[in-house]
Amino acid sequence: MSEPRKILVTSALPYANGSIHLGHMLEYIQTDMWVRFQKLRGNQCIYVCADDAHGSAIMLRAEKEGITPEQLIANVQAEHCADFAEFLVDFDNFHSTHAEENRELSSQIYLKLRDAGHIATRSITQYFDPEKKMFLADRFIKGTCPKCGTEDQYGDNCEKCGATYAPTDLKDPKSAISGATPVLKDSQHFFFKLPDFQQMLQSWTRSGTLQDAVANKIAEWLDAGLQQWDISRDAPYFGFEIPDEPGKYFYVWLDAPIGYMASFKNLCSRRPELDFDAFWGKDSTAELYHFIGKDIVNFHALFWPAMLEGAGYRKPTGINVHGYLTVNGQKMSKSRGTFIKARTYLEHLSPEYLRYYYASKLGRGVDDLDLNLEDFVQKVNSDLVGKVVNIASRCAGFIHKGNAGVMVDSNAAPELTEAFLAAAPSIADAYEARDFARAMREIMGLADRANAWIADKAPWSLNKQEGKQDEVQAICATGIILFRQLVIFLKPVLPLLAADAEAFLNVAPLTWNDHQQLLANHQLNKFKPLMTRIDPVKVQAMTDASKEDLAASQTDTGGPKGNGELVKDPLSAEIDFDAFAAIDLRVALIVKAEAVEGADKLLRLTLDIGDEQRNVFSGIKSAYPDPSKLDGRLTMMIANLKPRKMKFGISEGMVMAAGPGGEEIYLLSPDSGAKPGQRIK
């Protein structure tokens, strides 16, 4: 028998500035299932994580709440730990980056990089808030877009026109923190010489450590040439001060991944059998895997391995990247109630429902995963309750009533039992490859075969026939044998179900190799329901509660703040989908635009909507004093609006525009390629 593998596993560190939501949970559940599988197989697998507890955002939120940053991160960590525990995410250690182990390791790694010549310094010019006495990151600067003139845009890109720019390009810049006009100021910054590791990274990222799609994306950055990475921030900043550089702090993304090492080192201090160097030393033979989302690939596949290489530590064995979570086919939305916090979910539904659904959809690629709430209900109810648990509930009663709960020593389906045993290597391979969806398909295929066999044998009918009781006991004992096999295969995904099944089966905690042994002449405990069906009403209550979370947060903050459009023009009352669906929006070509004699605000628009022309009066004259410039332009119109008789004629629809009025009216246009008459949906 081969020696157990030594494996260290991490998930990305959640930021200690907010609650965990179901998008976050995708990663932690994925990682936990893989770790549980390794432990079930007898491998030494250690799972560590920590809160990412540094940065300006945490400092500013703590200030706003009137508490210290240390108090804030302690409060958030308690919330995170409770959510993870109830979702059955079983960390060996959950630490914080604001810890002495992380301070020591961050300083040590920085000094090794500095002494090896991998740190550069140079002066950079940044905006500085004269009231808060702090340099401003791009997201803390707002102003007018230099390209389209839209107000209240961030310092690096415009949300309206999509333009990107430097903060110094903004017109009328303001500090988003104090509202003060920032001034430009020079500061010395420290840079990690990432280009020093170009050759190593080109080789390492193609060595099987990354999925092919991720390696291809990284290759684009490598081919474009790596740039030095700014690793410093100026005081005031919540983080670790750079050694020998008072007033200069490590950028949060330098000490965050070092938090993996710090969490493990903290665990080593409490578990003397663990050796830090055996897992992190340059010559370590242990396996090291990071599970992350695709949004932070560059930090983990470029900066992190280069830092480790430069400081004399080992590099990861693999970086396992997953996609984003969507809900009902769309980005999570607070207004739709699909931006669901972990705590909100737990208040309504069992964590194992979601664990199974994620497992059934998770492959080894980086595609996004959709949580379709209708499919979620159907799949869990059908697979777990209707297939797996159904086997035990069908068989247990006959064994208790007919043989005092003792399974007879009889296998009524040797070929089917052998098929279950033979499936174990393939299911194990799927788990190992993180292809949880394939593992679930194979397991549910076995469950289907077991249910079909039991239905064919129909012990409930046989039990009514004289002299068939021994056959009934043999059938039901075989059903329990098959159920036990399924429980073993599902244990990494459904640890609570497995524990309850172990109690019913009257066995010690099951391991993977237990699938090779069959129960015979074995006393069962009384059967209790192992899982109930999802009630769709509870799912609706969960989404309703998520909408209430949004309403509460807006109430807490007094609604939208600042000079944004929602303050000037609040959202209208909600409408249902049917009301929206009744509106027929179409692409329209402006054939001719002309002034209306005797009307100060109106233009007469002749619109082509494909197979017919419409006459529409629109109050946009103040913004378009030369209406001929609109000729030939595509716009959008409401095509099924009841014709309206006006002083100057009949208006057969309405064109769509934005803006407060006057000269600030902006006629909406579809993207290039749209054709007159096409429906907008």
Curated annotation (Swiss-Prot):
Cofactor note: Binds 1 zinc ion per subunit.
Enzyme class: ligase
InterPro entries: aa-tRNA-synth_I_CS, Anticodon_Met, Met-tRNA-synth_bsu_C, Met-tRNA_ligase_1, Met-tRNA_synth, Methionyl/Leucyl_tRNA_Synth, MetRS_core, MetRS_Zn
Occurrences of domain tRNA-binding (ranges): 579-681
Motif ('KMSKS' region): 331-335
The keyword Cell inner membrane appears for this protein: no
Domain of life: Bacteria
Pfam families cross-referenced by the UniProt entry: tRNA-synt_1g, tRNA_bind
Single GO biological process annotation from the record: methionyl-tRNA aminoacylation
Binding locations of ATP: K334
Gene3D superfamilies in alphabetical order: HUPs, Isoleucyl-tRNA Synthetase, Domain 1, Methionyl-tRNA synthetase, Zn-domain, Nucleic acid-binding proteins
Keywords, comma-separated and alphabetical: Aminoacyl-tRNA synthetase, ATP-binding, Cytoplasm, Ligase, Metal-binding, Nucleotide-binding, Protein biosynthesis, RNA-binding, tRNA-binding, Zinc
Names of the cofactor(s): Zn(2+)
Function: Is required not only for elongation of protein synthesis but also for the initiation of all mRNA translation through initiator tRNA(fMet) aminoacylation.
PANTHER family: METHIONINE--TRNA LIGASE, METHIONINE--TRNA LIGASE, CYTOPLASMIC
Protein name: Methionine--tRNA ligase
